[in-house]
Regions:
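Phosphate-group recognition and catalysis centered on beta-loop-alpha active-site segments
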Residues: 1-348
Length: 348
C-alpha cells in the first residue's frame, strides 16, 4: 500500500492491525450514515472523527465507467434525479446510475433516504430530508479524503469497498471489478496487509476476484441467507470472511434473559473466516434487545463476531473502549492482588 506518513518520525506504512486489537472492528456503514446522508464526503469526515476502524464505500459505475460511491443501482431514493434530469428515466420508471455520466451525476443533490420502509425513519432523528447540498463523489475522491485525514489526524481508518451488481454492470458492458481494482491499485492498495476489505454478494464474482483477477486483498463474501458448515468451507477457499445480517448471529432472548446465539460464528471461525455483521442502528434495535449496550454485549461477547457495521459508529467505539477499560481494569486488580499475596508469602 502507498506509504502515508503521519509525522516525520512515524513509520510511513499503514497495515491492517485487526489481529492485534480487541474485537470488534467498527465499520462506519456508508460513512456516519446515522447522522449525515449516506456515502457523502461529509459523512466520511464525521466517521473518521468518530474513530471508526473502517469506512465503507459501496461502488457503482457511471455510464462512462467511473467508480462512484453510491449504494443503490438506482438514484430515486437518494437524489433529486427525477426533477433535475427527468429525460434519463428508463422504461421501468427508474433513474439508473449507469445511465448517467459522471458529469451528469455531479449535477444531482444527495439527500437522506426517502424509502418509507425504513423503521428508523419514524423516530425523526435522522438528517432532515431536504437540508444541505450533498454531492455524489468518486471512489478515488473518497480514498484521497481518507488518506488525507489519516495524515492529519492521530487515527488511521481503513476502507471497506463493496462491488455492487456485477451482473447488472456486465449487462451494460461495464466491468466493475476491474475498474475498482484499478483505482485501488492507483491508491496503493495491493497487499493483503493493507487496511482494506473488498466485499460482494455475487459468489461467482468473489471467485473471479481471487482466481481470474488475482487480487491479494482481503475479501468478504456477503450472505443474505444463513450458511451451513459445508458452504462456509467452500467460501473459505477464496474469501477471508463473511458479512451477514445481525439476525444470523443472535436470534432472540431466552426466558432467563440470555441471548439466543446461532452456531454461525463458531462454524465460520472453524474455517478461519472472520464474521462481520450488519447493520447496528441505535434507532432500530430488535425488539428483544433492551439497550444498545446489551445488544453489543450479545453480539461480541456471547456470539464472538469480529466486526460490526454501524450507522452510529461512535456508539460502538465508545462501548468497545468502555469494555476494554473494564477488562483491563479487572486484570490490573487481579495482578495487584496476586503480587500482594506473593509479597505476604515471602515475608512469612
Amino acid at each position: 500500500m502507498t506509504m502515508i506518513q503521519i509525522n516525520d518520525d512515524a513509520p510511513a506504512v499503514i497495515v491492517a492491525s485487526d489481529q492485534t486489537q480487541s474485537a470488534p472492528i467498527v465499520i462506519a456503514h456508508r460513512g456516519a450514515s446515522g447522522y449525515l446522508p449516506e456515502h457523502t464526503t461529509e459523512g466520511v469526515v464525521l466517521a473518521h472523527a468518530m474513530l471508526a476502524d473502517y469506512i465503507e464505500q459501496d461502488v457503482v459505475l457511471s455510464k462512462d465507467g467511473i467508480p462512484v460511491v453510491f449504494h443503490d443501482l438506482i438514484l430515486d431514493d437518494l437524489t433529486d434525479a427525477a426533477s433535475v434530469l427527468p429525460d434519463l428515466r428508463r422504461a421501468d420508471g427508474r433513474w439508473h446510475v449507469m445511465d448517467f455520466t459522471l458529469a451528469e451525476l455531479r449535477t444531482l443533490t444527495v439527500t437522506e433516504r426517502r424509502s418509507p420502509s425504513r423503521p428508523w425513519k419514524d423516530k425523526g432523528n435522522r438528517f432532515p430530508l431536504e437540508s444541505g447540498r450533498f454531492r455524489i463523489s468518486t471512489l478515488a475522491e473518497h480514498l484521497q479524503l481518507i488518506h488525507g485525514l489519516n495524515r492529519t489526524r492521530p487515527h488511521q481508518a481503513g476502507v471497506y469497498v463493496e462491488l455492487k451488481g456485477p451482473a447488472e454492470h456486465r449487462a451494460a458492458s461495464l466491468d466493475i471489478s476491474k475498474a475498482v481494482l484499478e483505482v485501488l491499485t492507483q491508491h496503493g492498495y495491493d497487499s493483503p496487509d493493507d487496511h482494506i476489505y473488498l466485499q460482494c454478494f455475487d459468489e461467482a464474482e468473489v471467485l473471479r476476484l481471487r482466481t481470474e483477477l488475482k487480487t491479494p486483498l482481503r475479501i468478504i463474501q456477503l450472505l443474505s441467507q444463513p450458511a451451513d458448515a459445508a458452504k462456509l468451507k467452500t467460501i473459505a477457499e477464496v474469501a477471508d470472511g463473511i458479512g451477514v445480517p445481525l439476525s444470523h448471529v443472535v436470534t432472540g432472548k431466552n426466558a432467563d434473559s440470555t441471548p439466543q446465539v446461532t452456531e454461525l460464528v463458531r462454524n465460520a471461525h472453524a474455517n478461519a473466516l472472520q464474521v462481520h455483521v450488519w447493520t447496528f442502528r441505535t434507532d432500530a434495535l430488535p425488539g428483544f434487545a433492551g439497550t444498545a449496550a446489551e445488544y453489543l454485549e450479545w453480539l461480541v461477547v456471547a456470539a464472538g463476531v469480529d466486526g460490526i457495521f454501524a450507522d452510529q459508529p461512535d456508539v460502538v467505539v465508545d462501548w468497545r473502549t468502555a469494555r476494554r477499560q473494564q477488562v483491563n481494569g479487572g486484570k490490573s486488580f487481579r495482578l495487584l492482588k496476586e503480587r500482594g499475596q506473593e509479597k505476604s508469602q515471602s515475608e512469612k
